Amino acid sequence: MKKDIHPKTFKATIRCHCGFEAQALSTKGELVQVEVCSNCHPFFTGKQRFLDTAGRIDRFRKKYANFEKKA
């Protein structure tokens, strides 16, 4: 077996922007910061955010309406 071919592992603290912290093994370093975790992600919390997709669809149709007329 070859020596020193495996990456070094650290006991890392994973920190979310919501303030949640967890401990895990990582090769990235001792502190890993994430934007979203299971504590604050809408899928896990049940708090869904609806985006204004109706306005986006209207803008898309208005922008590409001329292509439909020409074809």
UniProtKB/Swiss-Prot annotation:
Superkingdom to which the source organism belongs: Bacteria
GO CC, one annotated term: ribonucleoprotein complex
Pfam families, alphabetized: Ribosomal_L31 (PF01197)
Signal sequence bounds: none
GO molecular function terms noted in the UniProt entry: metal ion binding; rRNA binding; structural constituent of ribosome
Record keywords: Metal-binding, Ribonucleoprotein, Ribosomal protein, RNA-binding, rRNA-binding, Zinc
Cofactor note: Binds 1 zinc ion per subunit.
Cofactor(s) listed in the protein's UniProt record: Zn(2+)
GO biological process, one term: translation
This protein's record includes keyword Acetylation: no
Binding site for Zn(2+): C16, C18, C37, C40
Subunit note: Part of the 50S ribosomal subunit.
Function summary: Binds the 23S rRNA.
Name of this protein: Large ribosomal subunit protein bL31
Species assigned in the record: Solidesulfovibrio magneticus (strain ATCC 700980 / DSM 13731 / RS-1)
